[in-house]
UniProtKB/Swiss-Prot annotation:
Biological function: One of the essential components for the initiation of protein synthesis. Stabilizes the binding of IF-2 and IF-3 on the 30S subunit to which N-formylmethionyl-tRNA(fMet) subsequently binds. Helps modulate mRNA selection, yielding the 30S pre-initiation complex (PIC). Upon addition of the 50S ribosomal subunit IF-1, IF-2 and IF-3 are released leaving the mature 70S translation initiation complex.
Keywords assigned by UniProt, alphabetized: Cytoplasm, Initiation factor, Protein biosynthesis, RNA-binding, rRNA-binding
SUPFAM superfamilies linked: Nucleic acid-binding proteins
Summary of subunit composition and partner proteins: Component of the 30S ribosomal translation pre-initiation complex which assembles on the 30S ribosome in the order IF-2 and IF-3, IF-1 and N-formylmethionyl-tRNA(fMet); mRNA recruitment can occur at any time during PIC assembly.
Name of a matching Pfam family: eIF-1a
HAMAP family: IF_1
Ranges of residues in domain S1-like: 1-72
Cell compartments where the protein resides: Cytoplasm
Organism the protein comes from: Nitratiruptor sp. (strain SB155-2)
The keyword Transmembrane helix appears for this protein: no
Entry's family note: Belongs to the IF-1 family.
The name this protein goes by in its record: Translation initiation factor IF-1
GO CC annotation, single: cytosol
Protein backbone atom coordinates (compact mmCIF):
# COMPACT_ATOMS: atom_id res chain seq x y z
CA UNK A 1 0.00 0.00 0.00
CA UNK A 2 1.34 3.41 -0.93
CA UNK A 3 2.04 5.97 1.78
CA UNK A 4 -0.36 8.52 0.24
CA UNK A 5 -3.35 6.15 0.64
CA UNK A 6 -3.54 6.71 4.41
CA UNK A 7 -5.89 9.06 6.24
CA UNK A 8 -4.21 11.02 9.05
CA UNK A 9 -6.35 12.32 11.92
CA UNK A 10 -5.72 13.49 15.48
CA UNK A 11 -7.28 11.91 18.53
CA UNK A 12 -7.04 11.39 22.27
CA UNK A 13 -6.12 8.05 23.86
CA UNK A 14 -9.06 6.89 25.98
CA UNK A 15 -7.90 3.45 27.13
CA UNK A 16 -4.73 1.34 27.14
CA UNK A 17 -5.37 -2.30 26.23
CA UNK A 18 -3.12 -5.40 26.35
CA UNK A 19 -0.50 -6.05 23.64
CA UNK A 20 0.27 -2.34 23.09
CA UNK A 21 -3.22 -1.64 21.73
CA UNK A 22 -5.12 1.56 22.49
CA UNK A 23 -8.67 2.83 22.14
CA UNK A 24 -8.48 6.31 20.60
CA UNK A 25 -11.32 8.81 20.22
CA UNK A 26 -10.85 10.83 17.04
CA UNK A 27 -11.73 14.51 16.62
CA UNK A 28 -14.91 13.58 14.75
CA UNK A 29 -16.14 11.44 17.66
CA UNK A 30 -15.38 7.97 16.25
CA UNK A 31 -13.59 5.46 18.50
CA UNK A 32 -10.80 3.46 16.83
CA UNK A 33 -8.64 0.52 17.97
CA UNK A 34 -4.95 1.39 17.36
CA UNK A 35 -1.51 -0.14 17.71
CA UNK A 36 1.83 1.67 17.96
CA UNK A 37 3.98 2.20 14.88
CA UNK A 38 7.28 0.32 14.81
CA UNK A 39 9.49 3.43 15.05
CA UNK A 40 7.69 4.55 18.22
CA UNK A 41 8.09 1.07 19.69
CA UNK A 42 11.79 1.07 18.75
CA UNK A 43 12.43 4.39 20.52
CA UNK A 44 10.44 3.40 23.64
CA UNK A 45 7.90 6.22 23.31
CA UNK A 46 5.32 5.71 26.04
CA UNK A 47 1.65 6.44 25.44
CA UNK A 48 -0.79 6.94 28.31
CA UNK A 49 -4.54 7.57 28.43
CA UNK A 50 -5.19 11.28 27.87
CA UNK A 51 -2.33 11.77 25.38
CA UNK A 52 -3.05 13.55 22.09
CA UNK A 53 -1.81 11.42 19.18
CA UNK A 54 -1.74 11.33 15.39
CA UNK A 55 -3.43 8.24 13.93
CA UNK A 56 -3.13 6.76 10.43
CA UNK A 57 -6.18 4.96 9.05
CA UNK A 58 -6.40 2.97 5.82
CA UNK A 59 -9.34 3.51 3.49
CA UNK A 60 -10.07 -0.24 3.72
CA UNK A 61 -10.63 -0.48 7.48
CA UNK A 62 -11.68 2.70 9.26
CA UNK A 63 -12.09 1.02 12.66
CA UNK A 64 -8.39 0.11 13.10
CA UNK A 65 -5.39 2.41 12.97
CA UNK A 66 -1.73 3.01 13.74
CA UNK A 67 -0.44 5.63 16.19
CA UNK A 68 2.43 7.44 14.47
CA UNK A 69 3.06 10.49 16.68
CA UNK A 70 2.46 11.63 20.27
CA UNK A 71 2.06 15.38 20.74
CA UNK A 72 3.85 17.04 23.65
Amino acid sequence: MAKDDVIEVDGIVKEALPNAMFRVELENGHVVLCHIAGKMRMHYIKILPGDKVKVELTPYSLDKGRITFRYK
